[in-house]
Amino acid sequence: MQFKKLTEQSLAGKRVLIRVDMNVPVKNGVIGDDTRIRASLPSILHCLKAGASVILMTHLGRPTEGEPKPEDSLAPVARRLSELLAQEVKVIADWQAGIDLKAGDVVMLENVRLNKGEKKNNEELGRAYAGLCDVFVNDAFGTAHRAEASTHAVAQFAPVACAGVLLAAELDALGRALEAPARPLVAIVAGSKVSTKLTILEALADKVDQLIVGGGIANTFLLAEGKNIGKSLAEADLVGEAKKVIEKIRAHGGNVPLPTDVVVAPEFSENAEDTLKNVADVTRDDMILDIGPDSARVLAEIVAKAGTVVWNGPVGVFEFEQFSHGTRTLAEAIAESKAFSIAGGGDTLSAIAKFGVTDRISYISTGGGAFLEFLEGKELPAVAMLAARA
């Protein structure tokens, strides 16, 4: 996919409008995690260094359009950004009449979700945003799967529309992983439900050499292979779909390596007693909460030989120590592998952080829903608009 990049633009003396994703957790005016704010810095600093003035826009939470409340304000975000940039960043609520800026200034439009028509991708609002700038930059991969005025309409009407540092890196990494992957391509798709990831499983079935499934998804696949899973979380009504995915992968020489040994417990709790069992020995009162060491070893060997690894979801209840070993083994194997690795999704990122391998994953995706939709092969509207403007 071709699109213009911020790093290729001439910016001196220009007004640059950047759609960032600074939707951070805020409680009583205090930011809980500023990762997304820091992730936006490369694009902002690039513009400032080039002699531009910068206008930022982002959403925060889920406010009601046209009804501003104090808790919906970006003031805490602007404060934190001011600290990181070591310069004042003002929040501008009344920007429609224009903004007075000089080179080196950074300002932030108030929460875009307060603007009427934002979520409906209103053309008039998009034109109003576009009228503020010489160059529009989308640097918010996390919202790329939504067509909204601050991600889509604005890109249609701005004089120039391009991808920021973060978005360009994200698209390059995803393209490298899925559009022209080094083989073997190994995908790890785990989670509690097949139903939420079924379209991803179906889309990947045509592409991957090995599809590793985990969690409730693996239990449904074990059912599809005629195994007893006791009272484990699974979706019996989707066994047919699981069988189709397995058949599809095996038809082109790929495989779905299912666990041969598992860690079970009588209940789902932090204090549940864990027991290692062969899959064939699972009884009706067992809950499968992790893969066993033999299965983990097999998966680690698959990952070691991979050319590309795409990881979405832990293979066990890693939050509980006794059920964390499968995910730990897998995380460490990915970290040690020479493969190009990309990981995304909240639980996956938590697992990566817990096991201390963050710096050894080739690329960590910032987008939850957008990452999943890219895996599904869906067009991301905000990215498609950048491509149309290239």
From Swiss-Prot:
Keywords: ATP-binding, Cytoplasm, Glycolysis, Kinase, Nucleotide-binding, Transferase
Binding-site positions, substrate: 21-23, 36, 59-62, 113, 146
Pathway in which this enzyme or protein is active: Carbohydrate degradation; glycolysis; pyruvate from D-glyceraldehyde 3-phosphate: step 2/5
Chief location: cytoplasm
Top-level taxon: Bacteria
InterPro entries: Phosphoglycerate_kinase, Phosphoglycerate_kinase_CS, Phosphoglycerate_kinase_N, Phosphoglycerate_kinase_sf
Self-association and partners: Monomer.
PANTHER family: PHOSPHOGLYCERATE KINASE (PTHR11406), PHOSPHOGLYCERATE KINASE 1, CHLOROPLASTIC-RELATED (PTHR11406:SF23)
Family to which this protein belongs: Belongs to the phosphoglycerate kinase family.
HAMAP family given in the database record: Phosphoglyc_kinase (MF_00145)
Protein name from the UniProt record: Phosphoglycerate kinase
Organism: Laribacter hongkongensis (strain HLHK9)
Gene, per the UniProt record: pgk
